[in-house]
Amino acid sequence: MLQTPSNLNRFKHLGLALSIFYLLYNLTTVYSVSLHTLYPSQIHNLTTPFDSMIPFIPAMIVPYSWSLILFVASFFLVRTSTQLSLLAYRLILATIFACLIFYFYPARFSFSRSIPDDWTQFGYQFLQLVDKPFNQLPSLHVSYAMLLGVSLWNVFESKKRWISVAYRLLLTSICTLIALSTVLTYQHHLLDMFGGVVLAVLVLILSNRIRNALVIKHLILGVIGFLLIAIAGFYFANMSMIASEVVEDLAIMIASYWLISFTMLAGVYQQVKPIRDIRWFQKSSSGRLTLHTWIKFAPIIIIYNGMSLFGQWYFKIFSKSQKYSLTPYAINDKVNVVASPRLMQTDLSSHLTYWLFGSSLLELRSSLESNRPAVCHQIIVVDLAAEISSHTHNLEIAANGIMNTTVHYLYLPLLDLQPLNDVLLQDYIDLFQKIEALIQSVETQAITANNESWVEGNQVEDSQVKGGLITLINFHCVMGLSRSIGVQVLYLLYCGTLTVYNYQSWIEQHYPHAHLKDTYLPQSLVETMANYKSVTY
C-alpha cells in the first residue's frame, strides 16, 4: 500500500530543497559578482549569433514567476512518500550540480535590458533587485521546469481520460512557458537553456538509481563544504597582501579533498550490501583506522571524532540524572552484554570496573581472599563504527590495569544511519557465531588449564571452573544511540533471550535514549533473526 506523506513531512522536504537552493545559489552569486569586479576577464560570455534574433517580450515575466510557485506547490501535489522523496532528490541534485558549474564556469548575461514602462515594470524591478545577471549556465529555471513536469506527470489520475489528458497538456504548457521565458525575458542565453535541459536529463537518470536519502545527504555535504571552503579561500586570498595565490590554491585543494571524500562516502552508501567489502574503512587488528583509510576519509573521520566527543558529553549529562546507564545486561550467569559509545581513554577504567564488578570491588576482593577460584573475565569488543577507531586498545590497557583480562576484537563496519537490513543476514550470523566460538573457547581453555594443575593439588570441579568464567560483550559505535543497540538487540534475538513480542519494551526499559526507528531496525529483520536460533541458553 502506498503511503501518503504527512503535511509536516512535505514541509520538511520543501524546506530542505529551498534552503539548499538559497544557500548555494546566493553563495555562487556573491562569488561571481566579486570575481567580475576583481577579474572581469574570468567571467564567460555565452552569447551566440542566434541570441540576437530572440525578441524581448516583457509579458513573459508572468510565466517566469511561475517557477517558484510550481516549485512550492509540487511538494503538496505529489501523492505518495516515494514521489515526495524523488521530487526532493531531483530538485536538490539539480541545485548542487548547477552551483558547482556556476563556480567552475562563471558566466554573465551580456545583453542590456531596460525596464519596460508598463504593467510589467514592477516584476522586472523586483527581478533586478533579487537576481543578478550571473549563475547562467545551466539555467535552473529550465532544469526545474523539466524536473517538475516529470515529477508531477502521474500525480493526477481520472477515470475520464480527457481530464487526464487536459491535466498533462496544462502541465506541459506551464513548464514549456517557464522554460521559454528564460530567454524571452532576457534572463538567459540559448546555451544556458540547452545546459538546463542536459542537466535535467542527467538528474532524471541519476535520481532513479539513487538508493536512499543518505547518498543525497553526503553529496549535499560534499558540495556545500566545497563551495564554502573554496569561496572563503578566494576572499581570504584577495584580502591577503602576500602569497594570495598560495592561499587560494590551498583552499581549492582542501575543498576538492573535502568534495572527493564525501563523494566517495556517498558511493559507499550507494552500494548494495556493502559490508562484505571492507576496503573502504580498513582497521588494524586492534581497531585503529589504517593510514589508507585516513587518506581517503580524513574530513569524515575528523567530524565523527567530534561527534564521539559529543557522545561522551551526552552520556555524562544523562548518567547524572540516571536516564542513561551503561549497565550490562545478563544473558545468563556467564555472559553479559552492554552497548556503548566509543569511550575515551580517561573514562574506560571506571566503566570497565563497573561492567566487571558492579558498583564495588567486594566480589573481586572476596575471591582473592578465599580459596575458591577467582572469577575470570574475558571481554569481546564488537566494533560497529566504520568512521572512527575503536577503544579496544585502550580498553585492553585498562583491563590489564585492573586484572589480567583477555580482550578480543571483532569488526562489523556499519555506516552511520545505514538501515540494519542493508547488511546480509549471513554477516550477522557469522559475527554471532564468532562470539559464541570465543565464549566456548575460553571455557575449554580454562578446563584444560585446570586439568593440568592437578600436580599442584589445586584442581577443582569443571562446573566450578565454568561458573568462574564471565564473558562481557561490548557492542560499540560512535555515540551509542543506534548501531550498538540495534546489533545488540539482534544478538539477543539470535540467542533467544528476546522475542519479537518483547524486544521493543526491552529497548524502552534498558535504552530509552535509543534512536531505533522502524526503517532502521525493520520488523522483517527482527522476525528473521528471532527465527534463527542456533544457541539455547
Regions found by a protein language model. Give the residues of each.
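N-terminal transmembrane-helix/juxtamembrane module of multi-pass inner/ER membrane proteins
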Residues: M1-L70, I115, T120, Y124, ...
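Aromatic-anchored segments of alpha-helical transmembrane domains
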Residues: Y22-N26, T95-Y103, S173-V183, L227-F236
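Membrane-interface loops
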Residues: V33-P49, L77-T172, I178, L204, ...
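Membrane-embedded alpha-helical segments of multi-pass membrane proteins
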Residues: V62-L70, S139-L147, F194-V198
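Cysteine-based protein phosphatase catalytic domain of the PTP/DSP
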Residues: T120-L129, V142, F310-I447, G467-F475, ...
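Interfacial helix-loop-helix junctions of multi-pass membrane proteins
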Residues: F134-L137, T176-V203
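Functional transmembrane or membrane-interface alpha-helices that line membrane-embedded catalytic
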Residues: W162-I163, Y167-L170, G195-I220
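PTP/DSP superfamily signal
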Residues: R211-S308, I317, D430-N451, G467-N474, ...
